[in-house]
Amino acid sequence: MSYVKDIICWKSGASVTDGTPAICEPGDFPEVHYDLSRLAKEFDRDKLSHGPSSLWRYLPLLPVDDPDNAATLGEGWTPIVQTPALGKALGSPQLVIKDEGRNPSGTFKDRGACVAATRLRELGIKTIVHNSSGNAGGAWGMYAKRAGLNCVNLLPNDVLPASLCQSVYSGADTILLDGEWKHSGPMVAEAVQKMGWFNVGTFKEPHRLEGKKTMGLEIAEQLGWTLPDVIVYPTGGGLGAVAIYKAFRELMTLGWLPKGPLPKLIVTQYAGCAPVVKAFEAGVDHADLWEDLDVPPGGLKSTRPPGDQALLKIIKETNGAAISVTTEDAIAATTQAIDLEGLFPCPEVGTSIEGLRKALAQGMVTSDEKALIMSTGSGLKSVPVFPTPKFRTVEAGGSLSP
């Protein structure tokens, strides 16, 4: 049984028919609304502890009719890891990290792909298409296969090997774009019109957001139905961060979280693709096209983030910020996390580690605030981006002594 009430465009309020191309204008997006009053009467949050250790424990807050339809690989319920050594180094002693690298494909993208693929199968969709800088391509290839959907992935020609293999070996029709990435969106839109495929790109349909919303649901439950003071999130299209805050608002409406201020949102981007940061610093409510893309292979390639307006609104409402970080500083921060904590996040997360350092130095965040960094993916997805490690060699039979 689903508690979905309707799907409407976030900004305009226009109604959207499930399973059809969204009619929302640029800067707007389709959003699922639930009958939270009925849900609050019929479902108690204590029942969640009896559910599976996956995102499917939150079925009442997901847009799926039948849990038996779930195209699951065991995604979600990723740990929140205490990081005292890194926190001390940054000046944030209560710092914790939610490790999304534990998901099946190695990133948080599995959440959106899982829930959306499940719902699209229920709706009878046959072929999906989207443009991805890599991680979502791997996730969609895997979950489309799980759901029995045909998948067309448009990826950049510098896509990292792990994501490429996940896409190709799962049977997705994988196409590499030889040219500027800003052309990928229009190319997908043209294919949708010509072929009738269903576009599952960022904010193009409502169900990916609902899957990623489970990150916020987990944060609240894993922290004992409280919230951190600050959330630091590496941001490309903006879907993940927007989804987390949708979760918090729904939990407050249900009475599962006490009503109060939402966590301060700090979004971070590479300096070579920072349209949200540029908009934040200019004090405007939307991001313009970023022309000169200069980032390493992997995520955070969104030159015109479709969630820009929602993201900037959350930043403003929570007294947050948007911070850019050089590629070099991001990679250095990532290797610092490996050295101090034994965690192996992707370089995108390094923008958030270094971004938190900057936020603390500039007084945007204080040392007594509890900060949570969203580690959106595993460093295993991004090995070629890291510098060649230094190590010793020894001949067979030789000594291991220094």
PLM features per residue range, with description:
Residues 1-402:
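PLP-dependent amino-acid enzyme catalytic core
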